[in-house]
Amino acid sequence: DTNRLKVYINNTDVSADMTGGWPAEDVIHQLNQEFSDSSNQNTHNIGKGTRGSNYSDMYIADFAFVDGLQLAPSNFGETDEDSGIWKPKAPDVSAWGDNGFFLEFKNSAVGTGASDTIGADTSGNDNHFTSSGVAVTDHTTDTPTNSFATMNPLDAGAEATLSEGNLK
């Protein structure tokens, strides 16, 4: 059945793009799985494979994981009326669940997960993430909710017509 796991990226359901088929009913997934043996715990990884050192090279903003509920994309974002581009909004989530989290990546400090690091969970659950392979200089303040045009004063030979807050 195709309704047991939903994955959305920018309001697009990418669940059908997943390989390996759909999970059986009541299957225990690696994501969000807990073990009673502390030496065999599964860890949530964002941008890294579960085994080895396969890391992604990407920009990421507003990562939400809701445990136990299936919510619509409209709980997390909306389409901009002017540009037609999907943009994040404050999450409309009544309960994140025990293992749920919301990462806004507001802080630039790296290392062990805490409320003042890049992996701070702002859902209220305090499920902070430890960063690995990330430097303070990798953090950028140019995000979908904080975007500003930057002009290059050294490139005086170009002509431009600026509009929409100099973002176009």
Q: What do the PLM-derived regions correspond to, one by one?
A:
Residues 16-27, 59-126, 130-146:
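Extended recognition patches within non-cytosolic domains
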Residues 30-60:
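Extracellular glycan-interaction patches encoded by glycine-rich segments
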Residues 1-6, 68:
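Localized edge beta-strand/strand-to-loop motifs within extracellular or lumenal beta-rich domains
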Residues 11-12:
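Glycine-centered positions in the ABC transporter ATPase nucleotide-binding domain
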Residues 158-168:
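Short carbohydrate-recognition loop motifs
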Residues 2-4, 43, 55-62, 98-100:
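Extracellular structured ligand-interaction cores
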